[in-house]
Amino acid sequence: HIQGTAYGSMDDGATIIELMNEAGYDVATLGNHEFDYGMARAKAVIKEADFPYVSCNWVDLRTGLRVLPAVKLFPAGGKWIAFVGITTPESFTKSTPAYFMNAKQTKYIYDILGGDDGRKLYDAVQKAIDKAKTLGADIIIGLGHLGVDPSSSPWTSEEVIANTTGFDAFIDGHSHTVMENKQVYDAAGKAVTLTQTGSYLANVGKMTIAEDGAITTELISTADVSDAAVAATAEAWINDVDAMLGEQIATTDIKFYINDPATSKRRIRMGETNLGDFVADGIYTYFNEVEQLDCDIAMMNGGGIRTDVDAGKWTFKTCKQVSPFGNVACLMSVTGKQIQDALEFAARFAGEGGKENGGFLHVAG
């Protein structure tokens, strides 16, 4: 939640946390992008928040202890509601592995428990659920950043539910999926409500727990309400960023897209788009024409290309919105076999009826 656009990344998420504080958040968990600015910044974000963070599977390997509490309980309607925080083990690869290492980068000192078969993740989650029960929880809700993309297997929210018992509902993120209500069966055959709001606050999720424990969910896409303090903070920061990055640097006659123009569904993670081509062309041109180096092929993963761009002027902010993560382009010598392996691995979910994969490669050369 502190990444994704220029408004998040220009101050390493500080204003986003300020807005969350003013909005009155009660609890949050960490996703992979909370680590994008380094481990020290991730910990600072937690301290800046007026609300607690929970994660049952972020571990300090030097002590063997969790970095954060696994569970947070709240009283409501005469019952205790527990939230179990779960962070995607993909944080290692979808953030920066070095951030989880010691200063000399000789060994890992932090882990996001996952396991190649998912068992470490499932065990950590089950222990947290059991802990919530011992603390007196009447309702237990998973608060995860796991997603449902096949490329995230075996760490998807659906797999976590299927390999544990005790959840009553699960609020998910990571895959940017719009999912109002899906029933997923846990290891004991109990139906668990799984929900996800999509991305960029296109929806706000509403979960209602009835007196008898029945759970219903709703996705709210529009609301005629505003908080003056939150709106003022947001407007001031938007104006600051627009001023910093507002200089025009180019003009285009066409729309560049990450979403399929025919269906409006995101395509950048499963197939070619003109913006994916353009970004890869830009990397290729940079190395060959700006740095005067011998670059044969350029590759860029679709997960790092984040927004459509309408025809018209391009500013520095446009570039920051397209590629907000501050990734560094690298030039290396590889074999033809390595290139083939990379392309095949990137396209393993593509094709007819393909599934999203942030590692899908866009190429130039």
Which ranges hold each PLM region?
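Non-catalytic terminal accessory segments
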Residues: 231-365
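Acidic, metal/ion-coordinating pockets
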Residues: 1-226, 270, 274-285, 295-298, ...
